[in-house]
């Protein structure tokens, strides 16, 4: 029984092998022939499309305006240079238009081609108005894509890296916001020949990759699109504009500038708590803090272009500098009045000593005169002489010595100016910080859209 079953299985396998394998070979040959036929068909289609095609002439020449639909996909945005007022952007730049001369009929609705075909047909002469430098990537092959639909609609995509100008208004720096434009349009064709249209709405015509931001000092808030017409001596041209809205991050500047300035001002106010006779210590505090503020103000300006107006950081540094310099002037004032106090104390002590010596001399002179006048009478009378000899010589009444006031009490006393400064300076500086930060941090970012 088992032997019969094995024989049956072997016969079945043999039958499948003899029948299926030739069928598979025939099917493979048919598919290969179809592929060869498709290649032949598409080659003929391309040859027919290019036969008599003049890529020097735009589509619809003399009949209609060529409409070019555009959209942008941003793969990388940044960095942004404040000193040069420019930014770098890496994009897939897509353009779509219709060319009736490229209609075809075939087994496929879309022909997917590379850059070689793009050089043989008419393409828009798009350029970037505010671009300083533009690079078309060519590694390992030119990064270009061309698709032709059977109705003559073409999609032309290329990868570009553009360095574009970004006008900045730095009055609110570093709490500022900017709108960096990307402007492009036709170089040779006026609005009566070629016009540009955004393919989708504002959010879809310009898209940024989720991980496309390359910004360390900015947040990319979003983007907007627009369209305008400019006039020149050669005619009117369509200009497409995409604005990228940026808000600066303040964290770096808080650590680099604001905190050092605040700590320097606080350090300058420590001198109010030192004795006013500590001239070297208070001088070191004043001079060191002034020099520190000067260094901070210079370093803060190095990361900015040389603008003719003051920024928000400049105002903060200027006020901090004024507080530090005022602390030094306060010490000079206290020291000046301290020296005058020494002179007054010295004069009072000297005058008291002179008056004391003069009173003693007057008393001694009076006593000497009295003795000289009455001495002869006492010598003639023996009784009086005896009494005078036995009597003790009267001494002038001595007044208690007036000890001069110790100068140390006047010199070591705390100055009224220091007492006032300990309260006034911190209160004023705290009020300034409260007003400054409340004003700038609560202000809505003003995105200036440049024309």
Curated annotation (Swiss-Prot):
Biological processes annotated in GO: gamma-aminobutyric acid signaling pathway; inhibitory synapse assembly
PTM statement from Swiss-Prot or TrEMBL: Glycosylated.
Leader sequence segment: 1-28
Glycosylation sites: 38, 138
Activity regulation field: Activated by pentobarbital. Inhibited by the antagonist bicuculline.
Entry GO CC: chloride channel complex; cytoplasmic vesicle membrane; dendrite; GABA-A receptor complex; postsynaptic membrane
Major location (coarse): membrane
Protein name: Gamma-aminobutyric acid receptor subunit alpha-2
């Amino acid at each position: 029984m088992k032997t019969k079953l094995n024989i049956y299985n072997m016969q079945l396998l043999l039958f499948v092998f003899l029948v299926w394998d030739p069928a598979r070979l025939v099917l493979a040959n048919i598919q290969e022939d179809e592929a060869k036929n498709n290649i032949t068909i598409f080659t003929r289609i391309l040859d027919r499309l290019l036969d008599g095609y003049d890529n020097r002439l735009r589509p619809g020449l003399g009949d209609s305006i060529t409409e070019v639909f555009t959209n942008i996909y941003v793969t990388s945005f940044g960095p942004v240079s404040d000193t040069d007022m420019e930014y770098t952007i890496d994009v897939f730049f897509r353009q779509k238009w219709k060319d009736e001369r490229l209609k075809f009929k075939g087994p496929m609705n879309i022909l997917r081609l590379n850059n070689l075909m793009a050089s043989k047909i008419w393409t828009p002469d798009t350029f970037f108005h505010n671009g300083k430098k533009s690079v078309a990537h060519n590694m390992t092959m030119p990064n270009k894509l061309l698709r032709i639909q059977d109705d003559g609609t073409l999609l032309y995509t290329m990868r570009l890296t553009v360095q574009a100008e970004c006008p900045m208004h730095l009055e609110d720096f570093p709490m500022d916001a900017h709108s960096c434009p990307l402007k492009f349009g036709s170089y040779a064709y006026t609005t009566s020949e070629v016009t540009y249209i955004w393919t989708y709405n504002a959010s879809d015509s310009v898209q940024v990759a989720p991980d496309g931001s390359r910004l360390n000092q900015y947040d990319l808030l979003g983007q907007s699109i627009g369209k305008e017409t400019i006039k020149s001596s050669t005619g009117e041209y369509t200009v497409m504009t995409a604005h990228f809205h940026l808000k600066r991050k303040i964290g770096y500047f808080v650590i680099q500038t604001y905190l050092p300035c605040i700590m320097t001002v606080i350090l300058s106010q420590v001198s109010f708590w030192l004795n006013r006779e500590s001239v070297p210590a208070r001088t070191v505090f004043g001079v060191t803090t002034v020099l520190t503020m000067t260094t901070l103000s210079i370093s803060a300006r190095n990361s900015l272009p040389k603008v003719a107006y003051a920024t928000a950081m400049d105002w903060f540094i200027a006020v901090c500098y004024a507080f530090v310099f005022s602390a030094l002037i306060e010490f000079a004032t206290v020291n000046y009045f301290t020296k005058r106090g020494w002179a007054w104390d010295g004069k009072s002590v000297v005058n008291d000593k002179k008056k004391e010596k003069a009173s003693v001399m007057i008393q001694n002179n009076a006593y000497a005169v009295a003795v000289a006048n009455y001495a002869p009478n006492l010598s003639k009378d023996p009784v009086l002489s005896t009494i005078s000899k036995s009597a003790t010589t009267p001494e002038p009444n001595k007044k208690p010595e007036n000890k001069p006031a110790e100068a140390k009490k006047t010199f070591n006393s705390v100055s009224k100016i220091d007492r006032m400064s300990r309260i006034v300076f911190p209160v004023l500086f705290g009020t300034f910080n409260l007003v400054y930060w409340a004003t700038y941090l609560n202000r809505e970012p003003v995105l200036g859209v440049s024309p």
